[in-house]
Structure formats: C-alpha cells, structure tokens
Amino acid sequence: MDRGRCANMLKSLQRTLAKCQKSPSTNHWQCFKRNFTSIRATKYPGRSNSTFHYWPWFAASTLLATSLYYRDRPVENDDKTDAFPSHTESIQVDSSVSDFPLTITALNFPVSTTFKLLGYGQRHVTFLRFKVYALGLYLAENDENLVSDTLNETYLRKYFLDVDDSKTPKENLARLLKRDDSKSVMMIDDLLDSGMRMLAKITPVRNTDFKHLKEGLVKTISKHPDVANNKDTLAKGLSELNDAFSRKGSVRKNDDLIIELLANGALQFSYHDSKNNEFEVMGVVNNQLVGKFLFSQYLCGEKSPSPQAKKTAIDKLITLL
C-alpha cells in the first residue's frame, strides 16, 4: 500500500472530524455526510498486485460516521418506567421541533392557569405514515385532585359490574381506562364534565396552514362515539369553531397552536409564532361539546389522533387515582 496516500487519506478524515466537531450545528453526523461527499475516493493496491477498491476510505469513514451518528442520538432505555424525566424543564416529543415544556404558565403562554404535562406523542397520517405534528396534553395543576375525586371506588361500584374483587379500586379503574375503549370514553367524559381544565399544544413538524389545522380538529371531534346523539348541538359548535378559527395563511414548522379547555367547557385558541416569539389569541368556542369531544378523543377511544399521546396521558392519570 502507498503509505503516502494512506497518510493523506487519514489527514483528510481528521480535518473532516475536526471541522464537524467545531460546527455550531448540533448535528455533527449531518455535517460529516456533507463534507465526506466532497472527499475524492482513491484506489490502493492490495496483495498480489490486485486492486482493493476504496477499502481504507470505507473502513475509516465508517468508524468516523458511526462515532458522530451515535454522538448525536439521545440515549434510549428500553426498560424505562418514567416517561417524564426528572430534573428537567422540557422533553423531546419530536427531534424536528423544539422540546415541549413540562410546565406551561401564564408567564410564557396566554393561558389562565398553570398546566403540567400529562402526555405527549406524534400525529401520523394513517395512509402514508408520515408525521404531521407533535402533540402535548396538559392538565391544570390545581385540578389534579379531580381525577381521584371523580374516579373513585364509589364511581366504580355505581357504574361498572365487571369489577374484579381481587384487585384494588385503582387497579380496576386502571384496567378499564387502558383496556376497554367504550368504558374509557365514559370515564374520560365524566372527568371532563367535572370541570377539569386541560390544554393541548400542537406543533407542526412540517410547514402547513390554518385551514389544514382546523380541518384536522373537526375530523378529530367528529369521530367521537356520541356525535350521532348530538348532531344539532355539535353542528352549532363546529360553526363557532369555524368563526374562532377564521385566521388564514401559513403555519411554519415549529410554531404552536395552543388549545385551552376552560373550566366552563369553552375552548380558547391561541397561536404562537415561534420565530418572532409572538402570541395571538384567535378566538373562543363556548359550545361545551366541542371542547369535551376534542379532549375526549385525545385521551381515549380507538380513534385517538395520537395513540402515543393517549397512552402516556392515561398512564399519568392512573398515577393520580
């Protein structure tokens, strides 16, 4: 092998490594990919006068690429039991947008009270399976007691016959919430009727517009199992939603749509322009069915827009029983 060429090859890789490590971008792996394509491949002679095509390049570059790739990836624990990391103020819901805060207050958002993260996940378009937005579901800090006040042993014995007496009331309630879609809808709807305040933070992972966001909300609400029994009332509510969501135009990736469920059942919509850090209160829907059906779909049922957000939220609710 030509030692001079080999030395030049290693120097080129060293320069690439140094450049990417000093890059202001946090994604050193992407930096390496861009720069490596500009490095010209060279042939090196192998044993018995044969030609070994590019093997030193591939061997060295593979080691370097692997190092940079795993340096940029978060460490994942398959055995983790807590979906909410301790000693942090935010959590990554999707790598393409800003992390979601664990707490939302009136100091940083146009909301009426303090909210704690309940669950989070991503919304995928079912047919094509590409991501649309990241979703965070929040519960008002002062309303956490409503969970155990509403879903208790008295409630369990009053409304359900299939109670396993060998299990605690909490275990029975947890089983119904997690494994029975029809009963979980009833339980979550009763929780929402108690005046429990909630908030949804929707952050697009690709550029979109207000029309698509509104259409997505209407579709989610319309999939609630009680829609057929409330057609007239819901139709008026969706008309209110259309008026409250009258803003037109584009919504950039990483902007936020904030939907607050108020104590009286009304919904308040706000928009956060993340680039300029500006907020706008868009409007309010006073029809209680709209807010109830929307958050019910987020939290339960077989047609939830984000199964991951539903699961993490239910797991957290169970800890409050």
Curated annotation (Swiss-Prot):
GO CC terms of this entry: mitochondrion
GO molecular function: intramolecular lyase activity
Subcellular location: Mitochondrion
UniProt xrefs under Gene3D superfamilies: 3.50.70.10
Primary location recorded for the protein, binned into one broad class: mitochondrion
Similarity-based family: Belongs to the AIM18/AIM46 family.
Record: transit peptide: 1-72
Top-level taxon: Eukaryota
Sections of the chain in a coiled coil: none
Keywords on record: Mitochondrion, Transit peptide
Protein name, per record: Altered inheritance of mitochondria protein 18, mitochondrial
